[in-house]
Amino acid sequence: QPKSTPTLTVFPPSTEELQGNKATLVCLISDFYPSDVEVAWKANGAPISQGVDTANPTKQGNKYIASSFLRLTAEQWRSRNSFTCQVTHEGNTVEKSLSPAECV
């Protein structure tokens, strides 16, 4: 089966969650093959490892899908300019960023 590079989608925290002073970012990693992926998160370009929870890839058709969560406080979310989900797959790196300012 040919290799397939992952597609990334990053979802911002919900308004309800922010009202509760929490912020969870979700990075959806889809349509990749083979199943081996490495996920890293960055805040303002600096690696962030605390609060990261990555689920194991699951098969969807003949490709794989996975998700990674970054749990923050609302304050941490608001105080950074950008958050990036970075995925390394078969030696290639794909990243998708999200800016809190765009998610008001």
UniProtKB/Swiss-Prot annotation:
Between which residues do disulfide bridges form? Answer: C27-C85
> What SUPFAM superfamilies does the record tag this protein with?
Immunoglobulin
Domain Ig-like: where? 6-99
Show the stretches that span the lipid bilayer: none
Under Gene Ontology molecular function, one entry of this record is: antigen binding
- Gene Ontology terms describing biological process: immunoglobulin mediated immune response
Cellular-component GO terms for this entry: IgG immunoglobulin complex
Record keyword Lipid metabolism present: no
Q: Pfam families of this UniProt entry?
A: C1-set (PF07654)
Which UniProt key words apply to this protein? Answer: Disulfide bond, Immunoglobulin domain
Gene3D superfamilies recorded: Immunoglobulins
The protein depicted here goes by the name Ig lambda-2 chain C region
Q: Which organism is it from?
A: Rattus norvegicus (Rat)
